[in-house]
Amino acid sequence: MQKLTLTRPDDWHLHLRDGDALKAVLPHSARQFARAIVMPNLKPPVRTVADAADYRNRILAALPVGQTFEPLMTLYLTDNTSPEEISAAKASKFVKAVKYYPAGATTNSDFGVTDIRKCDRIFAAMEQEDIPLLLHGEVTDTNIDVFDREKVFIETHLIPLVSRFPKLRVVLEHITTSEAVTFVLNTNENIGATITPQHLLFSRNAIFKGGIRPHYYCLPILKREKHRQALLQAATSGNPKFFLGTDSAPHARNSKEQSCGCAGCYSALHAMELYAEAFESANALDKLEAFASFYGPDFYQLPRNTKTITLAKQTWQIPDEVPFPGTGLVPLRAGEEITWKIMDG
C-alpha cells in the first residue's frame, strides 16, 4: 500500500460556525489540521479583540477530549474598525489577521466594507503593526459578470492597494483565476494566496453536470477549465506564495438545496484526501507537504508543526451526509469514491 507521511498541515482559511454547528464540524478539522485561520463572519461578526477572545474560548470548549487544535483568530473589517483595535489585535497574540469582505459578497457579509478606499487608515495601521490583511477578492457591482468579479477586483482595487501599502502582508484568499495567479507571482514576497480543494479539482462544469448541483456552488464561483489548470500549476509549483486554505463552509442541507441556496462547499471532513488527489493528478505528490504544512506558517511567521499525519492509497466512499444541526451536512463529492485516506491524525 502506498503511504504518504506529511508534517501535520494547517488550514489557512476555515469556517467553523458557532454553537451546535461548531461542535459538529470542529472534530473534522482537528483530526487533520493542527491550526486554522478561523473566519469571523458569524452573526454578529467577530469585530473586536474581545469578540475574538470569546469565540476562541467557545472553539476550545467545543474541542473533543483527546484532540488538539489551535484556532488562529481574525477580526472582521468594517467601515468602523479603528486603528486602536488593530493595535489591540497585535498585542493579543491570538488575533493573527484581519478579514476584508465586500458588503454582500458572501455568507454573513452584510457588515462588510462598503468602499475599500475608506479603510486606508486601517491598512496603514495594519502595515505598521505587521498584521496580514485577508481578502475576499471580488467586486459586488451587479453590472459585473459573476465570473469576472475576481479579475475586476484585482484590477480595480488590489493593484492600487498594494501600491499604496507596499509592506502590508496580504493574502488573496481562495483564488480562482489565472489572473489571480499572475498577480501573486508578480508581486513581492509579502503577497500570498490560498487555494481550495474544489478549485483545484473542478471547473464550473461541475455545478451543472446533469442538472444543478448546489453542493459545488461556492464563492468565488468555480471558473473555466483553463483557470483550474492555472491554479493546479501554481499549487504544485513549489512556490511558497501559494498555500492551503480549504474555505470549508458548512451549511445544512436545506440551506443548500433550495431555490436560493447558500454558497459554500464542505471539505473539512476529507480535505487532505482531496488535496492529495489533486496533487497526484499533476504528478506532484512530492510538493504536497510544503503546500499544506510549510508555506502557510512561513508566511504567517509561525513555527512549522512537528507532528505528522499519514495518508494511504486506499479507496473509500465519502458519506452522503454527516451529522449537523437541522437537516444534516452534505460534504463535497458526497457518495463518491476517493482514493486517499488518512490513517492517523
From Swiss-Prot:
Binding residue positions for Zn(2+) 2: K99, H136, H174
Co-factor requirement: Zn(2+)
Protein's GO biological process: 'de novo' pyrimidine nucleobase biosynthetic process; 'de novo' UMP biosynthetic process
Coiled-coil ranges per UniProt: none
GO terms under cellular component: cytosol
One Pfam family this sequence matches: Amidohydro_1
CDD domains: DHOase
The family this protein is said to belong to: Belongs to the metallo-dependent hydrolases superfamily. DHOase family. Class II DHOase subfamily.
The protein's role, per its UniProt record: Catalyzes the reversible cyclization of carbamoyl aspartate to dihydroorotate.
UniProt cross-references to NCBIfam families, sorted A to Z: pyrC_dimer (TIGR00856)
Name this protein carries in UniProt: Dihydroorotase
Organism: Acaryochloris marina (strain MBIC 11017)
Lineage, opening ranks: Bacteria, Bacillati, Cyanobacteriota, Cyanophyceae, Acaryochloridales
Gene that specifies this protein: pyrC
